[in-house]
Amino acid sequence: MAHKKAGGSSRNGRDSESKRLGVKKFGGEAVIAGNIIVRQRGTKWHAGANVGLGKDHTIFALTAGNVDFRTKANGRVYVSVMPKAEAAE
């Protein structure tokens, strides 16, 4: 009897799509209003001045300027947008 036993089916072989999280605009980079600065799950980075926080914790620019990352005394990293200085008249 030259028979083979039935092979077992694999229960692995799946993976989820990557979510492309992380910093999209780094410190010192120029942004305009609406630009996404950070995509994250939870608040690894916190919203500072001139940025908004989306319902999925995305941090985005509210004004044009340069991105600034600051660590405060409480250990939290705050992301802000420093507006560009207006030309003196």
UniProtKB/Swiss-Prot annotation:
Keywords: Ribonucleoprotein, Ribosomal protein
Record bears the keyword Ribonucleoprotein: yes
Annotated segments matching region Disordered: 1-21
Pfam families, alphabetized: Ribosomal_L27
GO cellular component: cytosolic large ribosomal subunit
Domain of life (superkingdom): Bacteria
Family: Belongs to the bacterial ribosomal protein bL27 family.
Protein name from the UniProt record: Large ribosomal subunit protein bL27
Native species: Sinorhizobium fredii (strain NBRC 101917 / NGR234)
Gene name as annotated: rpmA
